[in-house]
């Protein structure tokens, strides 16, 4: 088993609604809520078939009394989407079973090692839902001084400037970010209601559906205030015929 690194799963939140008889305490689980309302940080690993079989045995898959193996999308720091297995127990009741101190420490130490927030863990331990995935990174026409910036003024507050890893291309009168080795300049915003904001931004960016123009991903943003994970929109079409913006800066490209 090889660790790839920190990653996020969108739409799911951490909970302790499963009682583990072997641990004699609660065990971590995931529950589906909605994009913009929940997300869960963790670690992404590359595994082989032998390891997968061992994990299935450990988690009790496919016995419905225990955890079920499910394919989800995990996003790494560069915004790349990975199809990954995770294990979810589909509890029929909204129970809360506190974990042991050792089990909690195991999760917390893992998050700290990967420099990931423990807010969602703390909420799960308190059986509450106060944590928010509240940041979005923009790098084109939604930035200050650009034609669609007004869309960010309703419900979003500028936090600071930032950069993400990737390559930037000129699509038309707007740019597109793709996974790459370059650095792309942009702005980080905090949303007052991310669920509502992404409904609007998804429509603007043509995200979702069977033939999207952009895909909304989760990506790590580098700022003067530190590293922040945020939603960002990646161009979903081929870039072979497009001009690459070497500077990674849409504002300076348009001066």
What feature does the model see in each segment?
Residues 1-255:
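A glycine-rich, hydrophobic/aromatic-adjacent loop/helix-cap motif
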